[in-house]
């Protein structure tokens, strides 16, 4: 490929709405062009990256025994109505109606359609296992699309779905796919972690996220440097504190804290560690009638240490809160506590509440909490003396760095990541909802055991950039770079020797199967180098009249600070030896 034939379009400045590095660089490098909110044209340079990502994913899916299929982007609503997702999913599910008044959805995923394929085509256990995958456009009507391809509305995703005869076989299929994902991300040349994830309402422990490590990542990844333990923040368990609760050493006291409504402010005022304070979080659950009207509400009080944050996923596993909860209204709080938020606590309640205590708080002594009175807190609070021993103690918090690892092999550390893949054991959730069965070996119908497996095809290049960039631009891994090598001849329009040498190297690399581009645009060296550094091509060869007369060319990897002089006769072998695909 020659640059004069290709579409090379770079910008000196990023658009004003570009917030993260990947969005800025993908736009400046001419990889994407915004068409609307969360909707982008994949320009030729960007499409080359996407196609390389797709090729690796497709190779490994096929190697793992999955079979490619393509399902419609626009799907009849009746399939989604069978599972209830047509009504349950929020406005992120784009619903449309055709000229005949029939309802459709623009697919965000394809569980319903693939389950329909299975129930029509897979009739016997003899046809199992099967794994169908597609690489297809998806759409989610995000309320606030942002970060370019990281959180767009239209995107490309690889989604695979496995069908098995029983749970054991389904779990085996899950492991096959999890290993395929590891091969995929290894081939991409990215630093990543496979982390245990919460399985949601389905339960079980078969759910893993694949996170590309990046300081700008939205997700917190918890891991143990001393072992293989890794989980996302939702999943990571905060172990119960070891050892007995300390004995009470302070008297209970009502203490003035004028204008201090946060744990941090109270701790500073009283000259105590933040860890001596307890925060009160007030939730509510609702009981509804057949019409969906609320007939009864229950108020809950959660107690967490002042320096800890609530983990909503863990809270949602507490019996009584597992059917759904919300934060209590100000009116509900005032009715039960007689006080506005900021000074709440478990003492001196107006109406009873259901109390849930975090493991850490359950072993605290002489702690501080709100007095249910504006500008006052209670100090020297102790279990068994000032309050009954807590009935419900649970892990309610996010772990923090330095907590003991759940596997008992060290302490936890936390880093940031970007989720680019997820493998998930589904069980019979969709097959039961759609009555998708096959005849088992005993001649009786049985529901398919399913798994689903996703990779964000267009999200992955953005994640790669967040991990691999510098002040000059993108630094692509060889495997997914738009071009692996760029040949940059200086004065090609003025020197027959430079032109001939550049075209020969270009031709030789093409013949050897190397993805190379020859920059024949006639740009000044500085502008030419700046373009390819911004675009992020990993390997650059510079040919000049002076260098060729000395029998040398210059090679520079995108990560190198300076170029290396290489004998002209050796450059082909030199480059081939350094390409890592």
Curated annotation (Swiss-Prot):
Gene Ontology molecular function: aminoacyl-tRNA deacylase activity; ATP binding; proline-tRNA ligase activity
Cellular localization per UniProt: Cytoplasm
Broad EC category: ligase
Taxonomic superkingdom: Bacteria
Key word Hydrolase present: no
Disulfide bonds: none
Matches recorded under Gene3D superfamilies: Anticodon-binding domain, Bira Bifunctional Protein, Domain 2, YbaK/aminoacyl-tRNA synthetase-associated domain
Catalytic activity: tRNA(Pro) + L-proline + ATP = L-prolyl-tRNA(Pro) + AMP + diphosphate
Assigned EC number: 6.1.1.15
Keyword set, alphabetical order: Aminoacyl-tRNA synthetase, ATP-binding, Cytoplasm, Ligase, Nucleotide-binding, Protein biosynthesis
GO cellular component, one term: cytosol
Pfam families: HGTP_anticodon, tRNA-synt_2b, tRNA_edit
GO biological process per UniProt: prolyl-tRNA aminoacylation
UniProt main location, coarse: cytoplasm
Keyword ATP-binding listed: yes
NCBIfam families linked to this entry: PRK09194.1, proS_fam_II
Domain notes: Consists of three domains: the N-terminal catalytic domain, the editing domain and the C-terminal anticodon-binding domain.
Family from the record: Belongs to the class-II aminoacyl-tRNA synthetase family. ProS type 1 subfamily.
Its biological purpose: Catalyzes the attachment of proline to tRNA(Pro) in a two-step reaction: proline is first activated by ATP to form Pro-AMP and then transferred to the acceptor end of tRNA(Pro). As ProRS can inadvertently accommodate and process non-cognate amino acids such as alanine and cysteine, to avoid such errors it has two additional distinct editing activities against alanine. One activity is designated as 'pretransfer' editing and involves the tRNA(Pro)-independent hydrolysis of activated Ala-AMP.
Binding partners and assembly: Homodimer.
HAMAP family for the chain: Pro_tRNA_synth_type1 (MF_01569)
Record-given protein name: Proline--tRNA ligase
